């Protein structure tokens, strides 16, 4: 996705060999036109996967997921990371380790938003170690539903997540694949 690649190279900041800051268009300030284009790419790739719902993890995956759900005319479900008095009782939960924050959290899904007939597309902003995507997949599969695919905005190809998801047999489609990060240097796989 050329527009995304350009934005990463022009506005992204490699803060270290494993941290890429893209808050000017993805996860603090959001470029709605770019999100819409991402939705188009995800829709075109996953259109024949018989998707019934699209899941994302709060919060940075929400914008591209909304645009994808709108274009595919499908319901979207936000998996919760934060505890809530409202989310009690009939829920699926799994523990996930956050690469970015270096902490664990309980990923939560209300049971009423998934059934065994669902084919779920999971969309997330980054793929690094694969923990978030695997946590979402555990919730989906724990409910007896199927992970039909995983859409990633930015994949860090040099980290273990992409290989891990591939080894588990998931169909992963990444809009941008980062080959290498060094302080001040970003190299994108073409």
Swiss-Prot record:
Keywords: Cytoplasm, Glycosyltransferase, Purine salvage, Transferase. It holds the Pfam family Pribosyltran. 5-phospho-alpha-D-ribose 1-diphosphate binds at residues 128-132. Its EC number is 2.4.2.22. GO terms for molecular function: xanthine phosphoribosyltransferase activity. One of its GO terms (cellular component) is cytoplasm. It is found in: Cytoplasm. InterPro entries: PRibTrfase_dom, PRTase-like, Pur/Pyrimidine_PRTase, Xanthine_PRibTrfase. The keyword Glycosyltransferase applies. It is an enzyme of class 2 (transferase). Xanthine binds at residues 20, 27, 156. SUPFAM superfamilies: PRTase-like (SSF53271). Its main location: cytoplasm. It catalyses: XMP + diphosphate = xanthine + 5-phospho-alpha-D-ribose 1-diphosphate. GO terms for biological process: purine ribonucleoside salvage; xanthine metabolic process; XMP salvage. It comes from the Bacteria. The keyword Transferase applies. Pathway: Purine metabolism; XMP biosynthesis via salvage pathway; XMP from xanthine: step 1/1. Belongs to the purine/pyrimidine phosphoribosyltransferase family. Xpt subfamily. Homodimer. Converts the preformed base xanthine, a product of nucleic acid breakdown, to xanthosine 5'-monophosphate (XMP), so it can be reused for RNA or DNA synthesis. This is Xanthine phosphoribosyltransferase. The lineage of its organism: Bacteria, Bacillati, Bacillota, Clostridia, Eubacteriales. The gene is xpt.
